[in-house]
């Protein structure tokens, strides 16, 4: 990606911070590209693959996202799409579909994704939403939301994608400080990924988000599905066209 499309080093900062918080996070760094003698900086970000999942201590499973096809249609095309098609989901890592078992897991994930109470099945969704509303609101758009399905628990883990990360004046509490050891480690990792030092604002955001995370993040191993959830389908998925 070109840096200006994702706020440059802020994208690297955000994915690294999510990793520190314990969220699965796509490996992201700044790289130098030489295209026919034209040298420029770009953002490298890994794909959501089996290797990504395993690096985050997750067994290979399905990653769901909403179908963003509708986003690219013109006004007339959208009318046709609304009349003839139902909202659908896309398997982000389609290489996962290898056999009947993986097909079943994907089908189960899609069925659960269509539930009215879906967001209650997403671990740490409230905290994830809170910090993205504050600093990376674009990442909460329906077409940018991705979810890793954990079949043996029947819950989902949020996966950040394309948040257009912005640190606007007046939104950050610079009174909150990150632990010295954490800050030192984070600064080292950030410099390795960007060849730049943390800015004062980035340091403030790190301290603020780490403070917000206190006693808010549930570890996957300690999370279990809520058996009282309503399994009724969201209305927009009930009428299959």
Residue ranges and their predicted role:
Residues 136, 148-241:
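C-terminal catalytic region of ATP-dependent kinase domains
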Residues 1-13, 17, 75-88, 180-206:
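A short, charged
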Residues 44-131:
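ATP-dependent phospho-/nucleotidyl transfer catalytic cores
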Residues 7, 11, 26, 121-126, ...:
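Active-site-proximal structural scaffolding
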Residues 1-81, 133-136, 152:
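Conserved ATP-binding subdomain of kinase catalytic cores across diverse folds
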Residues 118-159:
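Active-site acidic catalytic loop and adjacent metal/ATP-binding pocket
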